[in-house]
Amino acid sequence: MRLDHYLFLNGWKDKKECKRLIQTRKIIIDGEVEYNLSRNVDPQMHEIIVNQQQLTTFGHHYFMMNKAAGVLSANKDEHLPTYRDLVEEKNDALYPVGRLDFLTTGLLFITDNGPLGIDMLKPQQHVSKTYFVETWEPLEVSDRAAFEAGLEFIGGVRTQPAQLEILDVHHAKVAIQEGKYHQVKKMFLALGKKVEQLQRLSFGPLVLDEDLQPGAYRPLTQQEILSLKPYMRK
C-alpha cells in the first residue's frame, strides 16, 4: 500500500504531519531515509521505522492457488464458478494477478496489494511465466527455433522471443514474459498445433506448490513474500 495510507492506518491521520515526517527525515525504510509518500510498502517485506519505532502491523495478504479447470479467474460470475468461491477469506480487496483461462490450470497468485499486482503485469518488468503444455499434433525440433524468434498471429501481432523445452513428442514447457490474450495457445496454433492441456507452473519468482490439490490454496511463505520485493514500487 502507499506509504501515506500505511501511516494513516498507524495513527498519522493528518497529511501535513506525514509530510513533516518526510521533511524531518523521520521515516527510515530498509535503513534508508524515505522521501516518497506514494511508494508501495509492506511491513512483511520492509523494515519501516517512524520516529525511531518499527511498525509491523497492517500487512498485505498473499496467496497461491492451484486453479482447477472449469473455474473462472474472476471475483464473481452469475453462472460459472470462480476462484473466489473457493477462498474463505472475507477480503473484498483480493484479486488474481495475471488471470488464467477457464480451462487452464495451475498457479494463480492472489493478493490485496494492488500496486504490486499492477507493477508485476507491466511489460517492462519482464515477469516470466512458465507453462506445461500438451499438444494434439506432434511437436518438432524446429518449433524451438520458431519460439525463440517470436511468432506472428493472425492480424500481424508478434510475440517476443520465448523459450520452448520439448519434453516428448506431445509435451513441452514454455517460458514467456508477456501476457497477450490466449498467448500460449495462439503461439502453438501459429505452428499448426492445438493445445489440449495448459498448466501454469510459475509466475515470476513464485513456483506452484506440488502439494496443492486442484482448487486448493495457501498463504505464501515469508520467503515467497520476500521474493516479490523487487517488484514493489519505490
Tell where the protein language model's regions lie, with residue ranges.
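Basic, flexible Lys/Arg- and Gly-enriched helix-loop patches that mediate nucleic-acid binding at interfaces
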Residues: 1-234
